[in-house]
């Protein structure tokens, strides 16, 4: 355990930020999972709706520093392609 006051404060801040980031990351994963589940069932309307809901959540994670911009872009691009392919086949 740290003896210096500033180090103790940093530990407290880190714990709070870690918990906050973990919650944000979990939320992003939940939104992505909803899109993937809708794709798996083959329901293109539900998949599109879930994808539209997931987009701002991923962007928010980038803004907050939870995800890197390229990671979010890659995830959105791949999900978009899968939703588009599902819509085209329906």
Curated annotation (Swiss-Prot):
InterPro entries noted in UniProt: Ribosomal_bS20, Ribosomal_bS20_sf
GO MF annotation terms: small ribosomal subunit rRNA binding; structural constituent of ribosome
BP GO annotations: translation
Presence of the UniProt keyword Protein biosynthesis in the record: no
rRNA-binding found in the keyword field: yes
GO CC, alphabetical: cytosol; small ribosomal subunit
Keywords assigned: Ribonucleoprotein, Ribosomal protein, RNA-binding, rRNA-binding
Family (UniProt): Belongs to the bacterial ribosomal protein bS20 family.
Function noted in UniProt: Binds directly to 16S ribosomal RNA.
PANTHER family: 30S RIBOSOMAL PROTEIN S20, SMALL RIBOSOMAL SUBUNIT PROTEIN BS20C
Name this protein carries in UniProt: Small ribosomal subunit protein bS20
Organism of provenance: Acidiphilium cryptum (strain JF-5)
Source organism phylogeny: Bacteria, Pseudomonadati, Pseudomonadota, Alphaproteobacteria, Acetobacterales
């Amino acid at each position: 355990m740290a003896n210096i006051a500033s180090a103790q404060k940093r530990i407290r801040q880190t714990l709070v930020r870690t918990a906050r980031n973990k919650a944000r990351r979990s939320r992003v994963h939940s939104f992505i999972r909803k899109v993937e589940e809708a794709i798996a069932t083959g329901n293109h309307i539900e998949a599109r709706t879930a994808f539209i809901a997931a987009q701002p959540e991923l962007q928010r994670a980038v803004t907050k520093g939870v995800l890197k911009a390229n990671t979010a872009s890659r995830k959105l691009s791949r999900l978009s392609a899968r939703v588009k392919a599902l819509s085209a086949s329906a």
